[in-house]
């Protein structure tokens, strides 16, 4: 090889020359700007780096498994019967197998988010370049999850690339452990699941800060505009384009084309699932009204298609029904897929002319097309929508049954109840069919909101009744009135908001953060979300929402005719209701907790995961609720919260994830921590007494929310406020005083002021506490001391004597 020499050359006379410089050999890395930043002990942790922390919390919060079957079918040695403590051919037992199953769910969810992030980041770098600056609003901590886990403080799109490579590497290593003949211990499968959950929050954060920075989304904006939501907000008389999925990359070109051609008032543009939320965020950074409407969640997909309203459907990725193409083609609705994760067997038309594609789709020669060229898609989708609207009208495409057909369907029901057995929520379909036969639509109108439109009832029906169609036809009146408001996703919580509220959260005077996240698999419709949020907002909790929960919360109105978004401020403060955005914006919720530790407590967060998780568990009153969780992504989001010390409550369907993390409050030794001031042991309250659990009803969950926000660091005012809510919610929803309320009392000033004397009497008579009645003071009885200067920690190394 010849030796390289120095020299010069000129390109001034050359045309069409492009020079690309990647990494310059010997150049000082840009991160040298942060050379003085102190790094924690776990920068870019591997699978085993935080194992000690995981084992620490798993020692208190024990895994509880609820297997769906006793078999393992992973390899050709099997299937193996693991019941009765038997081992499979590879040596694994039922505990280990179920831990492995849960871990697989978690890393599947993490892969979905990081795959989304990789696709989106690649797309945005192609449009804006690696040097495009990151801007998420008023903050010095742009990416708290990224910084906490990797130590990287990203400033440009290019900085996110290496972090995402780290995420992808970790997911690969975790997936390798799933293979037969690898890990065998349940506790280490659990540790790996927790690692996958943590990694998921990094992947989500990358996805959202990239799109916020490039697509003119609101940036930590508490005054983000309101968007229309609901099937009733669509004007069915116009050509209608519906987008389904979670990745907004393809849709932005459609919105731009429609705006450039003056089509905003001529075409209805609506979305389902998180793409809908991100469509409303696009180009609303200046508080411009959204250009799109939100139709609803996954539970509205089949309903929307069966309505016949869409003229064209675009899908991207995640939470999309596998039968969209089949259902849409019945009604002559072309489907365009835009992402390699969902292709439906369609031909790739990315290199074909728009005219040829229009010809094939409008004539019905093809049911749909695969399109990776988003600029071409931007023109194709609106033009196709307008053409298909006319064609479908001319052909008289009929979707829902007529009134006469509806009566015939109801009369054909034999009331075998097979539909109700198949229904995930056991909805009273047979009773509604009887009422419909008598001309009463009200029973089905009630079922419309509760039906998740999974379609299982139709496959169970021996009379082949399209039950979803019956529900929707019977509910046309309520559907037409289904018009709500949802706050456009505001993005992260700003530094000024954290500075203002951090001290109140740690001391307990703001009783806590309640995060309503996750999917739409609710046991009793969307009203449950309204009930939860309204109750906690009235009690001055901070309520943060995202994804499907954020959408469905806007579907219900109170007696005043307003949604909660219209009643409560969108600021991170006591009594605030914040919509952070789509699924990937969940990272901003954990990010806010991390920022509390950094900004209020002045903790170093760079590569310092264990200490911040310890701080969260002991000091920050926060609880997550995934009331309708259904997906693997919901499992990974919740597990990431668990590792960070944030407890999560799932709805009744959450037991199908097959694993919970539940502590035993009566094991007093498990409820001791160190006081970092001197290393001495201190007793703490048994709260939270789970990191992941399920609740059967809203009534059961309500007092759990208040209890889950109690922390050892509460001052007397904070503990009094939290204990008041815990006791009142238990009495309101369960009709009883909580059995363990007295265990959270350290001194008389912890007691609710209005009931202090009555409660002191109960403490004396029923629990044997000694009371000085003259001064109304507790002399003896509490197992914990009130010491607001105490510094509770699970980590011995953080104690001063260490």
Curated annotation (Swiss-Prot):
Q: EC no.? A: 1.2.7.4
Enzyme class, top EC level, equals oxidoreductase
The domain of life for this entry's organism is Archaea
Q: Please write the reaction equations for the catalytic activity of this protein.
A: CO + 2 oxidized [2Fe-2S]-[ferredoxin] + H2O = 2 reduced [2Fe-2S]-[ferredoxin] + CO2 + 2 H(+)
Q: In which pathway does it act?
A: One-carbon metabolism; methanogenesis from acetate
UniProt cofactor(s): [4Fe-4S] cluster; [Ni-4Fe-4S] cluster
State where CO binds.
Answer: 113
Q: Which SUPFAM superfamilies match?
A: alpha-helical ferredoxin, Prismane protein-like
Which residues does the annotation say bind [4Fe-4S] cluster 1? 69, 73
- Give GO terms for biological process: acetyl-CoA metabolic process; methanogenesis, from acetate; response to hydrogen peroxide
What does this gene product do?
Part of the ACDS complex that catalyzes the reversible cleavage of acetyl-CoA, allowing growth on acetate as sole source of carbon and energy. The alpha-epsilon subcomponent functions as a carbon monoxide dehydrogenase.
The record describes its quaternary structure and partners as: Heterotetramer of two alpha and two epsilon subunits. The ACDS complex is made up of alpha, epsilon, beta, gamma and delta subunits with a probable stoichiometry of (alpha(2)epsilon(2))(4)-beta(8)-(gamma(1)delta(1))(8).
The identity of this protein, by name, is Acetyl-CoA decarbonylase/synthase complex subunit alpha
The organism encoding this protein is Methanococcoides burtonii (strain DSM 6242 / NBRC 107633 / OCM 468 / ACE-M)
């Amino acid at each position: 090889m010849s030796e390289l020499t120095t020299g010069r050359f000129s390109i001034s006379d050359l045309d069409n020359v492009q020079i690309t410089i990647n990494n310059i050999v010997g150049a000082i890395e840009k991160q040298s700007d942060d050379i003085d930043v102190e790094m924690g002990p776990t920068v870019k942790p591997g699978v085993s780096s935080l194992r000690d922390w995981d084992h620490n919390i798993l020692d208190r919060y024990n895994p509880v498994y609820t297997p769906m079957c006793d078999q393992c079918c992973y390899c050709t040695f099997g299937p193996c019967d693991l019941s009765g403590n038997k081992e499979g051919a590879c040596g694994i037992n039922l505990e280990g197998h179920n831990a492995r199953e849960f871990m697989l769910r978690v890393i599947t969810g993490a892969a979905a988010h990081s795959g989304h992030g990789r696709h989106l980041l690649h797309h945005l770098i192609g449009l804006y370049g690696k040097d495009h600056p990151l801007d998420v609003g008023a903050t010095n901590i742009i990416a708290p999850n990224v910084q906490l886990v990797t130590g990287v403080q990203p400033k440009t799109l290019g900085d996110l690339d290496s972090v995402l490579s780290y995420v992808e590497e970790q997911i690969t290593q975790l997936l390798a452990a799933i293979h037969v003949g690898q890990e065998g211990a349940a506790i280490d499968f659990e540790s790996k699941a927790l690692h996958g959950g943590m990694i998921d929050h990094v992947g989500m954060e990358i996805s959202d800060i990239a799109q916020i920075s490039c697509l003119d989304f609101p940036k930590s904006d508490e005054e983000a505009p309101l968007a229309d939501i609901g099937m009733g907000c669509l004007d069915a008389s116009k050509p209608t384009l519906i987008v389904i999925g979670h990745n907004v990359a393809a849709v932005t070109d459609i919105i731009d084309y429609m705006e450039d051609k003056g089509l905003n008032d001529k075409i209805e543009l609506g979305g389902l699932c998180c793409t809908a939320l991100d469509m409303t965020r696009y180009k609303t950074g200046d508080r411009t009204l959204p250009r799109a409407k939100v139709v609803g969640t996954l539970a509205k997909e089949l309903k929307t298609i069966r309505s016949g309203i869409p003229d064209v459907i675009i899908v991207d990725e995640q939470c999309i029904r596998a039968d969209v193409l089949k259902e849409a083609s019945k009604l002559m609705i072309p489907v365009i897929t835009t992402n390699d994760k969902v292709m439906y067997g369609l031909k790739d038309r990315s290199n074909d002319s728009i005219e040829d594609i229009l010809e094939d789709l409008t004539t019905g020669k093809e049911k749909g097309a695969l399109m990776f060229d988003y600029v071409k898609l931007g023109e194709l989708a609106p033009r196709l929508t307008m053409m298909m609207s006319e064609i479908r009208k001319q052909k008289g495409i009929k979707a829902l049954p007529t009134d006469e057909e509806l009566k015939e369907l109801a009369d054909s029901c034999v009331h075998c109840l097979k539909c109700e057995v198949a229904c995930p929520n056991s909805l009273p379909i047979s009773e509604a069919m009887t009422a419909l036969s008598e001309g009463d639509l009200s029973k089905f109108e009630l079922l419309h909101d509760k039906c998740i439109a999974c379609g299982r009832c139709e496959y169970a029906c021996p009379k082949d009744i399209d039950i979803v169609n019956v529900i929707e036809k019977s509910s046309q009146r309520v559907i037409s009135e289904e018009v709500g408001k949802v706050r456009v996703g505001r993005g992260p919580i700003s530094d000024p908001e954290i500075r203002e509220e951090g001290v109140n959260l740690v001391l307990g005077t703001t009783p806590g953060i309640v995060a309503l996240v996750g999917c739409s698999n609710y046991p009793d419709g969307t009203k449950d979300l309204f009930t939860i949020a309204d109750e906690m907002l009235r009690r001055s909790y901070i309520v943060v929402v995202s994804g499907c929960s954020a959408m469905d919360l806007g579907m219900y109105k109170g007696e005043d005719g307003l949604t909660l978004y219209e009643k409560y401020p969108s600021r991170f403060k006591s009594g605030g209701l914040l919509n952070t955005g789509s699924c990937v914006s969940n990272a901003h919720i954990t990010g806010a907790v991390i920022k509390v530790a950094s900004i209020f407590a002045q903790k170093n967060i760079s590569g310092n995961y264990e200490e911040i998780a310890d701080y969260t568990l002991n000091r920050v009153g926060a609880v997550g609720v995934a009331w309708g969780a259904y997906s693997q992504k919901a499992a990974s989001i919740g597990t990431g919260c668990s590792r960070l010390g944030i407890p999560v409550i799932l709805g009744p369907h959450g037991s199908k994830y097959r694993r919970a993390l539940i502590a035993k409050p009566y094991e007093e030794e498990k409820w001791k921590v160190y006081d970092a001031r001197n290393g001495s042991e201190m007793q703490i309250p048994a709260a939270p007494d789970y990191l992941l659990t399920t609740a059967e009803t809203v009534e059961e969950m309500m007092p759990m929310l208040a209890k889950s926000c109690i922390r050892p660091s509460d001052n007397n005012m904070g503990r009094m406020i939290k204990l008041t809510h815990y006791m009142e919610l238990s009495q309101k929803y369960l009709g009883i005083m909580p059995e363990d309320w007295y265990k959270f009392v350290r001194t008389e000033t912890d007691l609710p002021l209005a009931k202090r004397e009555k409660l002191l009497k109960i403490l004396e008579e029923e629990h044997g506490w000694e009371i000085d009645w003259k001064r109304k003071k507790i002399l003896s009885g509490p197992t914990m001391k009130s010491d607001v200067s105490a510094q509770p920690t699970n980590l011995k190394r953080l104690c001063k004597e260490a």
